[in-house]
Amino acid sequence: MNTKTFTPKSTMKIYTCLCLLFLAGYLVAQNNTSALLPMPNQITSVKGKPFTVRSGKTAIYLSQPELQFTANTLQNILSDRMQVEIPLASESDRADIRLLIDPAMEGNEHYRIEITSKRITISGATVRAVYYGVMTMDQLLLGDVCATTQKKISPVYVDDAPRFSHRALMLDPARHFLPVNDVKFFIDKMAHYKYNILQLHLTDDQGWRVEIKKHPKLVGKDYYTQEQLAEIIQYAAQRN
């Protein structure tokens, strides 16, 4: 067996390389754009102090009742990433995080994010657009983990709309059956990356996965009931 002796000089080189690798990882962690996927059309760093999330003081305002699910999603994101519970506010001037529908914006998936030291505004042409803005907000928090752990969000301006209206992924439960909760998990990940169409391949030689009440012998052991498929459709619709 060959052996190699490490001299002080070679050991120092190894130590230096390890330090550089650690520093590179640290610098990436400091960049709040490092987790953005897909990359927004426009993202601009803004000079100034970060926005600080304050438990008991920070609140979320939604301009329309249709944004309720989106607001709840943002509440869950802030709870998961920062361990803070943020309430909803009934009036705009009492909230420093605002979710707004702006019909003047062109394109039904066009959204903007404006983060300053005093306020966060996520606006979009539609409910769907605002939801995608919240997904980008989550990625900003993931990309800037050092600030996120301190309940701070770096100031930034984002203006984004998708290049393609059809953004699809396929699941194949016909060949490899997936429980309902696994399908929902996949939908959550699709929403995070702004995919908007899920194709479920439900029938093939390996299995028929759709319940047909008039033909019960079509299905085997693993299949989706009509109620489960309706549940999946509703779950996906909420996440656009």
Q: Language-model features: where?
A:
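Alpha-helix capping and helix-coil boundary motifs
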Residues: 19-21, 192
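Feature activates predominantly on carbohydrate-active enzymes
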Residues: 106-240
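N-terminal secretory signal peptides that target proteins for export/translocation
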Residues: 1-12
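Acidic, contiguous N-terminal accessory segments
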Residues: 12, 20, 29-162
